[in-house]
Structures are given as structure tokens and as C-alpha cells.
Amino acid sequence: MKIRSLLAAASLVGFAGAALAATDAISAKDQKVANKSVTAALVAASKAGYLVVHEADATGTKAGKILGNASVKAGENKDVTVALTSDVEAGSKLILMLHEESDGDTKFDDKDKPVMTDGKVVMQAITVQ
């Protein structure tokens, strides 16, 4: 009986993990740029891809120049750090955006398109402190 209960509990945990992995999301807070990098506390990806940091307009809604990227695996990725190619000033807005690995070359390039959920790009705007 104990074994059957353990197996049932394990299958429920596995199911919950699979459900989380199927949800694409980014969680990041406003932060100081330390060592020319920014960190997302959590990136959930249904497929392997990239967390890409873009410059943003003053409202934090329109993505601009790409400042850096980091690979993410399918599933839950904690404390994903992206090295930036340019300095950013306090008060600047950045957009952290999830991109899929579209062409199978495992290198981020312009073929790796943003991930969309319900017709919206999966992204999180932050302000540099």
C-alpha cells in the first residue's frame, strides 16, 4: 500500500512539474547592474531557448537593441544571469524576453524568434537602479 501511495504521489509531482514547464514566463525585479549583468529570478520555458535582454523605450513596452543573452533549458531555470555587451545607466529600462531556439544550431541569432503566449511576447520589463 505504501509503495502504491508513493508511486501515485510521485506521478502527481511529475505531472505538476510538466504543467509548470509548459508555461512560458519570466520573473525579474528592478535591479542594479552588477558586473555588467542582470539576473532573472526565474525563467520557465516550454522548450530550450534564450533569455534575451533588450534596451527598452521610456515606457518599457518597446524592445530595442539586444544587449545580451543566456541559454535556458526547457523547464524551470532559476537565477538566469545575462552578461551585457554595453553599459546601462541607472533609470534605464530593459526588457527581458524569452526567445525560442528556432533553427537548431544552439546559438542565439536573428532566426531565434520571441516566444508568444496568447498572442503576446513573453517578456518582463525592469528598471536599472
Show where each model-derived region lies:
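Sec/Tat signal peptide C-region and signal peptidase I cleavage site
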Residues: F15-A22
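Exposed aromatic-hydrophobic patches
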Residues: T39-A41, E76-D87
